[in-house]
Amino acid sequence: MELGSADAFDRMGTLGVEEEFYIVDADGRPTSGIDDLVYGPEPPEPLAGRLDHELFQFTIETQTPLIEDPDEAGAAVSTVREALVDHAAAHGYRIAAAGLHPAAKWRELDHATKPRYQAQLDRIQYPQHRNTTAGLHVHVGVDDADKAVWVANELRWYLAPLLALSANSPFWNGFDTGLASARAKVFENLPNTGMPTAFDDFEEFQRFERRMVEYGSIDDRGELWYDVRPHTGHGTVEIRTPDAQTDPERVTDFVEYVHALVLDLADRYEAGESGTSVRRELLDENKWRATRYGRDTDFIAPDSEGVVSLVSFVETESDRLGVDGLRSLLDAESGTAVQRRIHEESGLDGLCEHLTLD
């Protein structure tokens, strides 16, 4: 049974960034490529040991090295991305980035043969068979297991605004879904996804994790795919909400804010602050608003007394935490709007080209 330990939570403020991408052909269309890029010759640094694939043979994931200084996160993300693009090009492929690839038709694409994924396909069936999603996952190290659980609980309200700012997947299976983040809704069809409930402490979380494995609900702890989770292997709090981003600067902006927010919440835990009691239904409603409308919505306040606009959220959080990236995200055209505009102007071919990273 693969379970983590409270001992893993021993470093505060370190960073790790995981990004999921699409392998595409010369025309920017999805194509199987993991045999060459993951299982072929050893990839160059900094990809060695930090390159894997996902459920489909056209999905690939990178991990940054451990980042000690948050100011170096942007360079780390760019270095890994550039190495992936070069690695793909050396084998005749290109790389694309979005929450969903607009030209990916899951019935026509091959699943990976890794036993772990084959077991998931057999157990979960239809929801996993069509899971062509790609996300951005940010890990922040936390130096105490109970603190990590408390921070993860508190982070839940902030996830909907983050999804709204990251929304980058209006198209799925070849059509416009009308959603800002169709990825969020496609992924939520899987078990053990979406907004988790709060846990009292690490012991309760680990007991839940253990029972899910013991009772056969999951094969390992990595199959708890909630929007935020204490990662009992890495000793981090992992935010999994954002869509994959085409622009690396947007990734850096998200990382800056998530890092500052986790450190702020950790300080509040140390100061003895009581946790915020927020109804799961309210959190789900806020996430739905972000999924459907992206930036064009308000969010129900944590105390359910009134709503918070995205502009107000960005201004308040930017000033409170001293970060600039949130304003940059808000000021730029959203990924969803860009995709729809390019699709209108240049069709699917133009959109596929836009999403490539070279």
Swiss-Prot record:
It comes from the Archaea. Its EC number is 6.3.2.2. InterPro entries: GCL_type2/YbdK_subfam, GCS2, Gln_synth/guanido_kin_cat_dom, YbdK. Keywords: ATP-binding, Ligase, Nucleotide-binding. One of its GO terms (biological process) is modified amino acid biosynthetic process. NCBIfam families: gshA_cyan_rel (TIGR02050), PRK13518.1 (NF010045). Belongs to the glutamate--cysteine ligase type 2 family. YbdK subfamily. This is Glutamate--cysteine ligase. The lineage of its organism: Archaea, Methanobacteriati, Methanobacteriota, Stenosarchaea group, Halobacteria. The gene is gshA.
